[in-house]
Structure formats: C-alpha cells, structure tokens
Amino acid sequence: MAAQGFLLIATFLLVLMVLARPLGSGLAWLINDIPLPGTTGVERVLFSALGVSNHEMNWKQYLCAILGLNMLGLAVLFFMLLGQHYLPLNPQQLPGLSWDLALNTAVSFVTNTNWQSYSGETTLSYFSQMAGLTVQNFLSAASGIAVIFALIRAFTRQSMSTLGNAWVDLLRITLWVLVPVALVIALFFIQQGALQNFLPYQAVNTVEGAQQLLPMGPVASQEAIKMLGTNGGGFFNANSSHPFENPTALTNFVQMLAIFLIPTALCFAFGEVTGDRRQGRMLLWAMSVIFVICVGVVMWAEVQGNPHLLALGADSSINMEGKESRFGVLVSSLFAVVTTAASCGAVIAMHDSFTALGGMVPMWLMQIGEVVFGGVGSGLYGMMLFVLLAVFIAGLMIGRTPEYLGKKIDVREMKLTALAILVTPTLVLMGAALAMMTDAGRSAMLNPGPHGFSEVLYAVSSAANNNGSAFAGLSANSPFWNCLLAFCMFVGRFGVIIPVMAIAGSLVSKKSQPASSGTLPTHGPLFVGLLIGTVLLVGALTFIPALALGPVAEYLS
C-alpha cells in the first residue's frame, strides 16, 4: 500500500506541474497587462460597452473596486436567497431561506468559503444555484486572483503609485482564464456522467422495489468552477462523494488537479513576471514539501484502522468509515489534504470520521492560513506574507535590513504583515472560545469530549480561513452559528486582503536595490527551509494548545 500511495502522489504532482506550466505563462501575460493573443478586439468592445477604462489605480482605488464588487454581490445574493420562492427555475417549489441562513450562505460564497449549513438538494432552487452561487464562484475566484496580480506587480514595478486596473483584471481573469477552463472541465464531467439538466426531481423504482426520489439539476457547470475556483460548495449535500457530482475515478482525479491548477500556475507566473523563475520554483518546493509530508501522515493514520473499532474487537485493518468504497482510503486521504491545503473544502469522504491524527492534519493545514498551494490568489498572497516574515527573521539574524526581490522591507510592511497573519488565528481561537462558553454554541455539538471540541475548532478554522469543509457532527444551522461563522468568513477574507493591498501600495513606490554580497538569496534550498520553518513555527505556536485539547487528546485517550 505504501508503493500505491507513493505512486498516487507522484502521478498527481507530475500531471499538475505539466498542466500548470503553460497556464502560468498565460497568467504572466495578464499580470504584465498584455492582452492574450486574439483577445484585443473582444476586450475593446467589452470595455467600451461596460464603460471600463484602462486608467490604472492606486492601491486604495484597486481595493475599493474589489470590495465594492463583493459587497454588491453579497447584497444581491442575500435577497435572492430570501426571495427564492418568487424566482424561476424552482420545480420543487422550495421556499426562501431564513434570514440567518441566507446571510451565512451569501457571505460564504462571496468570500470563496462555500460553507454550507444546508442541504443543496432540499434547500436551493436551480436559479439560486446557477444565478446566485455559481456566479459568485466565478467572482470570488477572480477577486482573489486580482489581489495577487496587484501584489506581484508591486514587486516588479519601481517608484510608482499604481497597481493596474481592477476592472480590467477581473474581466480578463474571468473571460480568458476561469470561463474557458471551467467550460472544458464541465464538458468532461458531462461526458463522464455528471448531471446537467433542468428536470424536476425523478421518482424511480429501485431494484428492491422501493421508490426513490432522485435530485436533478445543472450540476456539471457548477462543479467545474467549484473546483477550479477553489470554492468547494457542493450542489448536493454529499458534495463530491455524490456520484451525480463526481461519477468516476477519472473525474475525481481531474477534480483534485483543478483545485491546485491555478495556485500552482500562479507560482510559475510569479517567477516569470519577476524575471527569476527560481523564485517561483522556490515557492513550489516549499509548498510541495509540506504537502507531501501531510499526505503521508494522513494516509498512514487512515491505513492503521479505527482504534475504537479495534478496541471493540471488530475488524478494522483500515479506516473505511465515512469513505466511498469506489475511492478507497488512499485517494480519500489525498483528496482531504488537497481540499484543505487549498481553500476549496469539497470532500469525497467525511472528515469527521477520520482518525484523530488523520483529521488533525486537514484542520492544521487550514489553521496555518491555507498557504500550501492554497486558494486561487489567496494561497499565494498568504504565502508571500510568510516570505516577508522569513526575510525579516533572516535579516535580524545577519544584521542587515531585510529585502526581497530588491525591495527593502521596512517597519510599515512588517506591521501590515503581522496584522494580516494574526487575523485568522485570532478569529479561530476567539470564535472557538465563544462557542464553548455559550449554550447556543455547545448545543450544536453531537459528540462529547475532545472530538466534540474538535468539531467546533474545525468549523471555526474552516470559516475563518475560507475553506468551507466541516466535521459534519456539528449542527451549524442555527442563528448563533450562522452569524458567528458569517462574521469569521467575512473578516477572515477581507481582513487579510486589506493589509495585503496596503503592502502592495507600499512596495510599488520603492526602488529596487541591486543585490550585494550581503543579500540573502531567496531562491535556494536554504531559504526553502527557512520559509517552511517559519510556516511551521507560526502554526505550531498558535494552535498547539487548542489542538492538544481536541485531536491530540482524542488520539491519546
């Protein structure tokens, strides 16, 4: 089984790198504000029709454009969900959502979290799924990519005040990256057997003679951007373990590739735009090392079997509880790490049924900020915060002013970096504490003891870091949990984007200094180790006490 696991990981990473490399070159064109071949005429017509100019924006204007678009999307989606029963494409006559669930869902999809306190097939109409959630899947992904575009430009430009035009970036990202790739993936899913229709739910007779109601809907089109945009919200409650969403082993492999495709391509693009491809490879090496170790730990933990079943004398050579037999332990373990290393949150197995250590690793990957490949855009700008922190620490050790890519990292940048890094840990720890201190929070726990606390900690970690996956033993559809998690999702998203954009605004105004004999190389194995150590150190110091009360205590009990 060890050989199978190694082959699975190696094949996945090899295919990923092959696909991401050319996409990274295309993204580099867009970052450099160069239209892709054959798109100039279309862009001219669209920009003219929409009133979009090529006038560049400073960081505040760029940020306001991103925030304005997202706030408008939040309001539209909120009222759409409230009035769902008045809108078309609702063959099941599903009612509108309660205000707290509508708020939670709207915030969830606008922030690229896709936390779901509802069951899609019994709660949302086709119109809400398509015009509401799927649209936000595109816009939230484009927003994250636009932010990293601005940050990369800040490193490559000198003595300037502008970072590009947010509207141009958003349109280009959506039209030339997200829509075409998602279309290809959706067509492949349809060919493999995923649903794509507007039929009412179908009553069928089973082999045993019972009657069953099969949900229908435009699944494949939402499934494609759900993965490509690292959104993660399933059309059905079972998410990607449902055969109508993920019908074959091949679609499952493509889904995992789609999750990491753009985050990996952005690393290649970063190297091209900065003029030093080693910088992009350095980031990929750091991410890949952490990723492979985490996959190995989860696979090892899950093939050991369930200790609780073993204690009862049951046969549990491997832990198959909560897993699809058509995928198995190794694929389920790989998918769990992929979906939590990125900000996706889609699942093919119930993370709540993983072993204590097997469930702790996905939780920890979210808690460190989902910087191991991470979400589209958000993963790379999150990792860049750790790069700046690592450069600062190295500068202190050698007694020189820290610099990265020729830009000096001063007090302002470090204050903003520290602020951005501290946002999500503060939300996670305070949110979990609030939930455990209140009756409304504790009443949602279906399990006592360390595992019950793990469910709470996982939920808040998932929301604050915009992942969206869950330990499903938590009954989160209540006003308390819907409001708490909506707050965590909102602040966890925009509370990081704001300081990141401020950092970009500060860096773009600086001149690049030529490298000297005292400059720390940031492209070699030494810096890779320093960066990994910084990520691990911050994650360990912040969350070890909380993890000790949850999964660690469960493992030792």
Curated annotation (Swiss-Prot):
GO terms assigned for molecular function? P-type potassium transmembrane transporter activity; potassium ion binding
Q: Return the GO cellular component terms, semicolon-separated.
A: plasma membrane
Q: Mind listing the UniProt keywords for this protein, alphabetically?
A: Cell inner membrane, Cell membrane, Ion transport, Membrane, Potassium, Potassium transport, Transmembrane, Transmembrane helix, Transport
Could you tell me the membrane topology recorded for this protein? Multi-pass membrane protein
Predominant cellular place of this UniProt entry's protein? membrane
Give the residue spans that cross the bilayer.
5-25, 63-83, 132-152, 170-190, 253-273, 283-303, 329-349, 356-376, 379-399, 416-436, 484-504, 526-546
Its annotated compartments are: Cell inner membrane
NCBIfam families in UniProt: kdpA
Q: What does this protein do?
A: Part of the high-affinity ATP-driven potassium transport (or Kdp) system, which catalyzes the hydrolysis of ATP coupled with the electrogenic transport of potassium into the cytoplasm. This subunit binds the periplasmic potassium ions and delivers the ions to the membrane domain of KdpB through an intramembrane tunnel.
Into which family does the record put it?
Answer: Belongs to the KdpA family.
Cited PANTHER family: POTASSIUM-TRANSPORTING ATPASE A CHAIN, POTASSIUM-TRANSPORTING ATPASE POTASSIUM-BINDING SUBUNIT
Q: How does it assemble?
A: The system is composed of three essential subunits: KdpA, KdpB and KdpC.
The name this protein carries in UniProt is Potassium-transporting ATPase potassium-binding subunit
Q: What is the lineage of its organism?
A: Bacteria, Pseudomonadati, Pseudomonadota, Gammaproteobacteria, Enterobacterales
